[in-house]
Amino acid sequence: MIQLRSIINVADNSGARKVQCFKVRGGHHRDIATLGDVIMCSVRDAIPTSSIKKGDVVRAVVVRVAREKRRKDGSYIRFDENAVCIINENGEPKGTRVFGPIARELRDKNFLKIISLAPEVI
């Protein structure tokens, strides 16, 4: 569960390390984001040589959440941390690598490029 003002790790090599959520896309007065949701973030920590700088406003998709999420088959999925991947306006990732496991729910939301870059899909 990602709330407003949550500090989140970045799971790709786009150049940002940590971002802060300030808007959850997809509805009026929507305050909580979960797996596969698109959020607007401000970069809080970045690699010095990257094109993404501290303070930049970026769009990101949630790929891991620490709160358990119930799947349709009755099983639950949860991760050790909250993580996002930075995307552009078309929904394609800005980075060329994705680190760590990715939830299968991203396939249902048509983030297939992120799924193909991930080392493991759970």
Swiss-Prot record:
According to the UniProt entry, its GO molecular function terms are: large ribosomal subunit rRNA binding; structural constituent of ribosome
- A GO cellular component annotation in the UniProt record: cytosolic large ribosomal subunit
Q: Which GO terms describe its biological process?
A: translation
CDD domains (UniProt xref): Ribosomal_uL14
Name the keywords, alphabetized. Ribonucleoprotein, Ribosomal protein, RNA-binding, rRNA-binding
SUPFAM superfamilies in the record = Ribosomal protein L14 (SSF50193)
Q: Does the keyword Isomerase apply?
A: no
Keyword tRNA processing on entry = no
The record's subunit annotation is: Part of the 50S ribosomal subunit. Forms a cluster with proteins L3 and L19. In the 70S ribosome, L14 and L19 interact and together make contacts with the 16S rRNA in bridges B5 and B8.
Its annotated function is as follows: Binds to 23S rRNA. Forms part of two intersubunit bridges in the 70S ribosome.
Q: Which family does it belong to?
A: Belongs to the universal ribosomal protein uL14 family.
NCBIfam families registered for this protein in UniProt: rplN_bact
- The name this protein carries in UniProt is Large ribosomal subunit protein uL14
Give the source species: Elusimicrobium minutum (strain Pei191)
